[in-house]
């Protein structure tokens, strides 16, 4: 169980899932899930496509951050409806691979957008903590539903 489940309304642990926000209000946000994006074509012309270095996971976070850095805005729109065929992104089929890919993509995302802002010792600490988180997450697999 992650901290997002223990503290569902805490912005620190739930910013990606937007659980801390009123789901009935349209609002500007720092990012949204790639499974429910509507994007103007002009934005692709401005910033490019999704970054293919992200095989699985974090491609949406990377895209939203690049959108914001280039002066565009990202909105959560509660009335928008999208049919997401399939879902789960393969997480049920191979949970070990999904966990590994999530952590690898998060590492790439951090390295691309944030590592240059910190000194090497902090980055090493961050990478070590991510590795520990990966190992601990693997230990939780038998307890998942």
Regions found by a protein language model. Name each.
Residues 1-3, 40, 106:
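Generic structural signal for conserved hydrophobic packing positions in ordered secondary structure
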Residues 1-29:
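Short, flexible, basic/aromatic active-site loop/helix in glycosyltransferases
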Residues 2, 7, 131, 144-145:
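Short, flexible coil/linker elements and helix-boundary hinge sites characteristic
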Residues 11, 15, 40, 46-47, ...:
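Residues in flexible loops and secondary-structure boundaries
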Residues 17, 21-22, 32, 45, ...:
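A generic structural signal for ordered alpha-helices
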Residues 21-81:
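A short, conserved alpha-helix in the catalytic core of glycosyltransferases
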Residues 65-144:
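Active-site-adjacent helix/loop segment of glycosyltransferases
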């Amino acid at each position: 169980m992650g901290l997002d489940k223990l503290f569902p309304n805490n912005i620190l642990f739930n910013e990606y899932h937007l659980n801390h926000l009123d789901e009935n209000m349209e609002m500007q946000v720092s990012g949204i899930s790639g499974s429910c994006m509507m994007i103007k074509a002009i934005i692709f012309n401005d910033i490019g496509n999704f970054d293919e270095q992200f095989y699985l996971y974090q491609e949406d976070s990377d895209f939203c951050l690049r959108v914001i850095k280039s002066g565009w805005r990202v909105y959560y729109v509660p009335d928008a409806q999208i049919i997401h065929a399939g879902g789960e992104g393969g997480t049920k089929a191979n949970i070990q691979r999904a966990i590994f890919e999530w952590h690898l993509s998060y590492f790439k995302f951090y390295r691309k957008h944030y590592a240059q802002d910190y000194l090497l010792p902090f980055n090493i600490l961050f990478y070590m903590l991510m590795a520990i988180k990966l190992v601990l997450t693997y230990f939780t697999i038998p307890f998942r539903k």
